[in-house]
From Swiss-Prot:
Protein name: Eumenine mastoparan-OD
Subcellular compartments: Secreted; Target cell membrane
AXPX repeat intervals: 24-27, 30-33, 44-47, 52-55, 58-61
Keywords assigned by UniProt, alphabetized: Amidation, Antibiotic, Antimicrobial, Cytolysis, Fungicide, Immunity, Innate immunity, Membrane, Repeat, Secreted, Signal, Target cell membrane, Target membrane, Toxin
Residue ranges the record assigns to the propeptide: 25-62
Keyword Lyase tagged: no
A Gene Ontology biological process term: hemolysis in another organism
Record GO terms (molecular function): toxin activity
Species the sequence originates in: Orancistrocerus drewseni
Main location: secreted
Function text: Antimicrobial peptide with strong activity against the fungi C.albicans (MIC=6 uM) and B.cinerea (MIC=10 uM), and weaker activity against the Gram-negative bacterium E.coli (MIC=97 uM) and Gram-positive bacterium S.aureus (MIC=97 uM). Shows cytolytic activity against insect cell lines. Has potent hemolytic activity against ovine erythrocytes (80% at 50 uM), but has no hemolytic activity against human erythrocytes. In vivo, peptide injection in the vicinity of the head and thorax of lepidopteran larvae induces feeding disorder that lasts one or two days before recovering.
Residues of the signal peptide: 1-24
Amino acid sequence: MKQTIVIVLLAAVAMMACLQMVAAEPLPEAAPAPSPLAEAEALASPIAEALANPEALASPEAGRILSFIKGLAEHLGKK
């Protein structure tokens, strides 16, 4: 009976030591979230490059992008 109690106590101590070691590990640091301005600039830079290049406006994709930009500008009131 005493032997069982000692084994259970040693197991509990070992389990607590393992939990303490796991809890002591630092959490991985998350990358800081980009600011809304930086995110908007990253999204707008390919569009600005396409609008600056007249040959790019001749592509079929440019028509969709241009119509999206015009619709967005109208929606925001920047006609």
